[in-house]
């Protein structure tokens, strides 16, 4: 029998509900329970695939091709359980499915309403495919009181009423702000947030109180009294030195124990040795490297959330601190002096994915710098494409090389993928098609050349990686690019789609069409990030 933990947020957004859900799931998992985490997103987009990175942050892609919220990345990294399409739902998808059914006549003439049709769809989502689980943690996006979130709150209220009393637990994440002028933590915002939640029919069982100062016992007692919870169920959640220290901190404050107490369960103490190990690696590095990330969305680091974490994983694997220098690609279009000034201090250069023409000449310039100066280079998605364009222009003699994504070109070294094979059959796309849900998404196999650098890094010649792209390096240019020094060391199984390029005449120069950062985990750092940081460590010793 699955038990459900519903996680809501109050007072303000960005309190860390996703990290809290991931940390609690990791603690329950460490006690021997089977867990899965799900995310309810109240926005009306069908998925975040067409949303601006500045609005939404990173789009996290699952093995089965779902474009989801970045919180699912936290879920995977903390639990090691691969997320699926079935773990993320949006209001947009719910309404689309309901309207499709209504047009088809599935409701037999009934009036379609928020209650019961929308709330039933939410409840069905929460309970789907849970037979083999002990705990299902459901995070509700946004803040209690948001208009778009009301159907989700109502659905959870109904679900609590329909399930056995020992099957549900409500955890409310709230803010206890510190007022410096008064020198006090204020509990009133938490009281009002809980009052709003109870007004919607839900009494929280546990309060997780985010605060920047330790929560005094007197304030915990006050919150417990006014919010109608046990004092032991008021859990302080102070800022942590690293997100990977959060599970240890929550365990020390008794969060997982309080959850088990609520459900009337007993379990062995959690084995947290591996969490203690990675926190030790993070807090006590034996060296330091600086990585320059030349991107388009550097004003919002959430746009590169998994990338940032994967670099940290590579650092922990090599016992070094990774300092990330976020560099706006457009600045590199001003000339060589600016490029040299920004990139010379770097021990490694990474060009991540992105869409559109803006900043691409700056990315190409940074690739050239890395190639000529023999600085470790890692290109991901658009970064690989720009590495191929740079190689075409400067080492293969194809002066007008470009991408059709940026406009008409006589030398389309990069072009739109018109068709590719999936498990279901042949997928086809056209230049003028819809943007949403039409990319090459999810996990695909690649075959690696046996004597290549990447095969040595992976320790295998067959790999599976997650993709999210509409454009691809044009295989018709493969022979000319290889004459210029680029080696196509990874291809799709049919040999038509380039997946990896590298330069044998360079200490560490690799471009990949996929997104390896999506599969990196703190306990299993992705081999490419582990290798990239190792190369940066060697570079740091040379300068």
Swiss-Prot record:
GO molecular function terms here? ATP binding; CTP synthase activity; glutaminase activity; identical protein binding; metal ion binding
**EC nos:** 6.3.4.2
Q: Name one GO biological process term.
A: pyrimidine nucleobase biosynthetic process
Name the keywords, alphabetized: ATP-binding, Glutamine amidotransferase, Ligase, Magnesium, Metal-binding, Nucleotide-binding, Pyrimidine biosynthesis
Q: Where does Mg(2+) bind?
A: 71, 139
An example GO CC term for this entry is: cytosol
- Additional info? CTPSs have evolved a hybrid strategy for distinguishing between UTP and CTP. The overlapping regions of the product feedback inhibitory and substrate sites recognize a common feature in both compounds, the triphosphate moiety. To differentiate isosteric substrate and product pyrimidine rings, an additional pocket far from the expected kinase/ligase catalytic site, specifically recognizes the cytosine and ribose portions of the product inhibitor.
Give the record's subunit note: Homotetramer.
Q: This protein is called what?
A: CTP synthase
**What is the organism of origin for this protein?**
Novosphingobium aromaticivorans (strain ATCC 700278 / DSM 12444 / CCUG 56034 / CIP 105152 / NBRC 16084 / F199)
């Amino acid at each position: 029998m699955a038990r459900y933990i519903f996680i809501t947020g109050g007072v303000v957004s960005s309190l860390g509900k996703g990290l809290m859900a991931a940390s609690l799931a990791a603690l329950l998992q460490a006690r021997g329970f089977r867990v899965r985490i799900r995310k309810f997103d109240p926005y009306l987009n069908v998925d975040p695939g067409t949303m601006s990175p500045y609005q939404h942050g990173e789009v996290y892609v699952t093995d089965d091709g779902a474009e989801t919220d970045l919180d699912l990345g936290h879920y995977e990294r903390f639990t090691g359980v691969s997320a699926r399409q079935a773990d993320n739902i949006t209001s947009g998808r719910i309404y689309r499915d309901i309207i499709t059914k209504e047009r088809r006549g599935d409701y037999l003439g009934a009036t379609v309403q928020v209650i019961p049709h929308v709330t039933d769809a939410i409840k069905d989502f929460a309970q789907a495919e849970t037979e083999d689980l002990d705990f299902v943690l459901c995070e509700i996006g946004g803040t209690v009181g948001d208009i778009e979130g009301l159907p989700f709150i109502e659905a959870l209220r109904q679900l609590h009423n329909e399930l056995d009393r020992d099957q549900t637990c409500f955890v409310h994440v709230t803010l206890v702000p510190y007022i410096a002028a008064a020198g006090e933590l204020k509990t009133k915002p938490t009281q009002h947030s809980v009052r709003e939640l109870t007004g919607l029919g839900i009494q929280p069982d546990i309060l997780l109180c985010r605060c920047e100062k330790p929560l005094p016992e007197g304030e915990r007692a006050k919150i417990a009294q006014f919010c109608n919870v046990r004092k032991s169920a008021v859990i302080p959640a102070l800022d942590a030195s690293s997100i990977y220290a959060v599970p240890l901190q929550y365990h020390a404050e008794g969060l997982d124990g309080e959850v088990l107490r609520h459900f009337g369960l007993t379990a062995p103490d959690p084995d947290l040795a591996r969490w203690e190990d990675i926190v030790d690696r993070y807090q006590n590095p034996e060296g330091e490297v600086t990585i320059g990330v030349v991107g388009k969305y550097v004003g919002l680091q959430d746009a590169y959330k998994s990338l940032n974490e994967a670099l940290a994983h590579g650092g922990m694997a090599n016992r070094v601190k990774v300092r990330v220098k976020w560099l706006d690609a457009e600045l590199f279009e001003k000339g060589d002096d600016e490029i040299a000034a920004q990139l010379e201090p770097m021990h490694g250069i990474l060009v991540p994915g992105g869409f559109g023409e803006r900043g691409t000449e700056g990315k190409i310039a940074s690739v050239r710098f890395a190639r000529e100066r023999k600085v470790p280079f890692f290109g991901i998605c658009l970064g690989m494409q720009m590495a191929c364009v740079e190689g075409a222009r400067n080492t293969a003699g194809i002066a007008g090389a470009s991408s059709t994504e940026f406009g008409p070109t006589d030398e389309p070294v990069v072009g739109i993928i018109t068709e590719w094979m999936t498990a279901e059959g042949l997928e086809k796309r056209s230049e003028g098609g819809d943007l949403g849900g039409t990319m090459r998404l999810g996990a695909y196999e690649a075959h690696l050349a046996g004597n290549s650098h990447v095969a040595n890094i992976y320790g295998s010649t067959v790999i599976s990686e997650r993709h999210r792209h509409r454009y691809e390096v044009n295989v018709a240019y493969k022979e000319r690019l290889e004459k210029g020094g680029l080696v196509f060391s990874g291809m799709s199984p049919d040999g038509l789609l380039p997946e990896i390029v590298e330069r044998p005449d360079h200490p560490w120069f690799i471009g990949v069409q996929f997104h390896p950062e999506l599969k990196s985990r703190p306990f299993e750092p992705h081999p490419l990030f582990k290798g990239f940081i190792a190369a940066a460590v060697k570079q740091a010793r040379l300068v």
